[in-house]
Amino acid sequence: MSFLTEVETPIRNEWGCRCNGSSDPLTIAANIIGILHLTLWMLDRLFFKCIYRRFKYGLKGGPSTEGVPKSMREEYRKEQQSAVDTDDGHFVSIELE
């Protein structure tokens, strides 16, 4: 049961749960939605770099590097990785000259 649907009351020197039953369809639906929401939020926080990179580039791994020299490919890869690594914070510091 969810904390939102339970009421804890002292009963005979113990903490118990006074519930009307968990067979209420609205309660079951709310619990399922809550569990799904929590699961999706946790997966998003764990894998957000991979997930959003997939949205940006689709099913391919990134922009095509066909015909580009290997040194330029490596430089581009490092640049993209550093851009992803700096995206960990919510705020970006911009200094104006």
From Swiss-Prot:
Query: Where is the protein localized?
Result: Virion membrane; Host apical cell membrane
**Site (Essential for channel activity, possibly by being protonated during channel activation, and by forming the channel gate and the selective filter): residue numbering on this chain:** 37
Q: Where is this region: Disordered?
A: 59-97
Primary location group: virion
Q: Topological domains (Intravirion): residue ranges? A: 44-97
Residue numbers for the site described as Seems to be involved in pH gating?
41
Q: Explain the regulation of its activity.
A: The M2 protein from most influenza A strains is inhibited by amantadine and rimantadine, resulting in viral uncoating incapacity. Emergence of amantadine-resistant variants is usually rapid.
Where are its TM segments located?
23-43
Membrane topology listed for this record: Single-pass type III membrane protein
**Positions glycosylated per UniProt:** 20
What does the record give under GO molecular function? monoatomic ion channel activity; proton transmembrane transporter activity
Composition bias, Basic and acidic residues = 71-80
- Gene Ontology BP terms: protein complex oligomerization; symbiont genome entry into host cell via pore formation in plasma membrane; symbiont-mediated suppression of host autophagy
Organism superkingdom: Viruses
UniProt entry keywords in alphabetical sequence: Disulfide bond, Glycoprotein, Host cell membrane, Host membrane, Host-virus interaction, Hydrogen ion transport, Inhibition of host autophagy by virus, Ion channel, Ion transport, Lipoprotein, Membrane, Palmitate, Phosphoprotein, Signal-anchor, Transmembrane, Transmembrane helix, Transport, Viral ion channel, Virion
Question: In the record, which residues receive a covalent lipid, type S-palmitoyl cysteine?
Answer: 50
Of the GO CC terms on this record, one is: virion membrane
Phosphoserine occurs at: 64, 82, 93
InterPro entries membership: Flu_M2
Describe the task this protein carries out.
Answer: Forms a proton-selective ion channel that is necessary for the efficient release of the viral genome during virus entry. After attaching to the cell surface, the virion enters the cell by endocytosis. Acidification of the endosome triggers M2 ion channel activity.
Another remark in the UniProt entry says: When the channel is activated, one or more imidazole moieties of His-37 probably become bi-protonated.
For this protein, the record's HAMAP family field holds: INFV_M2
Sequence similarity: Belongs to the influenza viruses matrix protein M2 family.
Q: What is this protein called?
A: Matrix protein 2
Gene encoding it? M
